[in-house]
Amino acid sequence: MNTYAAYIDYALKKLDTFPVDMTGGNDNTVLLKDYQLFVAKVFLGLNSMNSILLFQETGVGKTITTVYMLKNLKKIYSEWTIIILVKKALIDDPWTHTILDYAPEVMKDCIIMNYDDQNFHNKFFTNIKSINVKSRIFIIIDECHNFISKSLTKEDNKKRNTKLVYNYIAKNLMQKNNKLICLSATPIVNDVREFQMLVNLLRPGILTPDKSLFYNKKLIDEKEIISKLGCICSYIVNNEASIFEDVENTTLFAKKTVHIKHVFMSKKQEELYLKARYLERKLGISVFKIYQRMASTFVFDDIPDKKKLTEEEYEKFVDSLSIDFKNTLYGKKISKQSLDILSAGGTINDIKDVKDIELYNYLYEHSCKFTFVCVSIIQSKGKCLVFEPFIRSSGIEILLQYFNVFGITYIEFSSRTKDIRSKSVSDFNKVDNTDGEITKVCVFSQSGNEGISFLSINDIFILDMTWNEASLKQIIGRAIRLNSHVNNPPERRYVNVYFVVAKLSSGRSSVDDILLDIIQSKSKEFSQLYKVFKHSSIEWIYSNYTDFQTVDDEKGFKKLISRNIILDENTITNKKKLTMGENIWYSFSSSLVSIHRGFKSMDNKIYDSEGFFITVLPDKPTIKIYEGKLIYILTVR
């Protein structure tokens, strides 16, 4: 690893005189942080370093770092064509706006493309054919985990057109010293194969694609993988804790406090939720739990049986239910007197107005989550975000009816507001709306869980659990960003994160409980792969490997990073050992989101139920009591 460090040092010295800021149109100037300059100098300073992953948490300035590189490209070579592959929602903001603000002179060389476009692959190859043969290509893939997912062969074995673009980039990356930079705060989301595909995009052919990386959930030959992947990424993850862990504030980031809010369904909502569960099993679609997820959030007066209706009949039935519900609420609002009671911390039991009580109970009858969120929003001291992935039927469309009844001002960021959503977010983020006095809340769907920055947020409400921790991290990352709370007074530089979990009166697990457990179980393998990225990053190498001899050129770098990874399963020790200790309960969350069986050895080592080592218990461990059990709260680094 010292050899990698020598080449990093060479690149830094080569570009030592690079500017520390960049100025664009209208004298817009930004001063780069040291870590931003570090990665830019290393990547541009090594001509034969064709690729890098910016594995950096949300809000640290990945876009600014990349635009800085674009601004300084012609100091390396005179002719560049820049291809930026992004989600449609990110084309204008941040990419086009940031380039025009700080590097407008490179805009003429840029081709910005939406990889969600069904015709993306054809447009990509049309643009490739138009590039001058003398030009080098600088490719940027933002939120690269989405691009990788679209290139991955799924269980249906359908052809993925994005894979054609993936193959082209992997094949042509090494030619003419082209450059590829991938950006993501969560490079692995759903599948270990995403790691393999990403590595083979950055370092083509280095890793056998069909060979398993794990044996019994344990990474095979970790040292070999790290040694061959040196300098593959920049790793800036200041908070490696679980999304369910509280994090103290720093000078640059707001404090995060996590709350798991259990809200009991009304009798009516529970009955319809159980019907939704039955219909899912009857229709054979329970694997995605769509019916249950929707019913745990909101229910109409009935749930139609899709099996007995045509698609058109089903849509008409749902539309009629929606219209009936909206008509029932038309013109109705909770009085200011009752809102004042609730905003001061009161409950429904403190309200005296009979009509308000009836209206509140009607709303709660149909959605325990929406009602809880509305009350929480009016009690919040600042601005709020609400994540709701569903738009029609029981999603955002109905939630906004609740907002109207409670007098909550809002903007919506979803697929149905694409023409105005960027402007809406810009207004929402303005300094004169720091306290939410103009617009209190932004409700957003999956369209807004990546690439968008929200400023001065104090409360986030997550109404539906995604299938993985990475997506939840992206959602939370929209509000906790570098200097995102600089306009807040010191006492309000915090973000409360509420996971709103619908509960059944019987105490049985709801779909929200099930999804929380799924999220926890996926993280075991992913955490090992994230460790690989961390220990092969340019930051880790340059900080921890200082015993190197300086180099005068980069002749050997290409060969160093092109070595194949050869996995040896013998590096896994499978022999059973008898260890003395005791059975315990443990959780990775101080909120006790999920509790696991484990084993504590005499020397304070903690193992999971399958015998795999987790961590070493500190001298003064954190222990909580829950339902008569002693629960060890573990922190894994």
Swiss-Prot record:
GO BP of this protein: DNA repair; DNA-templated transcription; replication fork processing
Reactions accelerated catalytically: a ribonucleoside 5'-triphosphate + H2O = a ribonucleoside 5'-diphosphate + phosphate + H(+)
Name of one Pfam family that matches: Helicase_C
Recorded GO MF terms: ATP binding; DNA binding; ribonucleoside triphosphate phosphatase activity
Domain Helicase ATP-binding: 43-205
EC number annotated for this UniProt entry: 3.6.1.15
Region ranges (Binding to the cap-specific mRNA (nucleoside-2'-O-)-methyltransferase): 459-526
Binding site residues for ATP: Q56, E57, T58, G59, V60, G61, K62, T63
SMART domains per UniProt: DEXDc (SM00487), HELICc (SM00490)
Claim: Repeat is one of the keywords in the record: no
UniProtKB keywords: ATP-binding, DNA-binding, Hydrolase, Nucleotide-binding, Transcription, Virion
Keyword Ribonucleoprotein (UniProt): no
Domain Helicase C-terminal: 358-537
Family membership: Belongs to the helicase family. NPH I subfamily.
Protein role: DNA-dependent ATPase required for providing the needed energy to achieve the termination of early transcripts. Acts in concert with the RAP94 subunit of the virion RNA polymerase and the capping enzyme/VTF to catalyze release of UUUUUNU-containing nascent RNA from the elongation complex. NPH-I must bind ssDNA in order to exhibit ATPase activity.
Known partners and oligomeric status: Monomer. Interacts (via C-terminus) with RAP94 (via N-terminus). Interacts with the cap-specific mRNA (nucleoside-2'-O-)-methyltransferase.
Protein name per its UniProtKB record: Nucleoside triphosphatase I
Source species taxonomy: Viruses, Varidnaviria, Bamfordvirae, Nucleocytoviricota, Pokkesviricetes
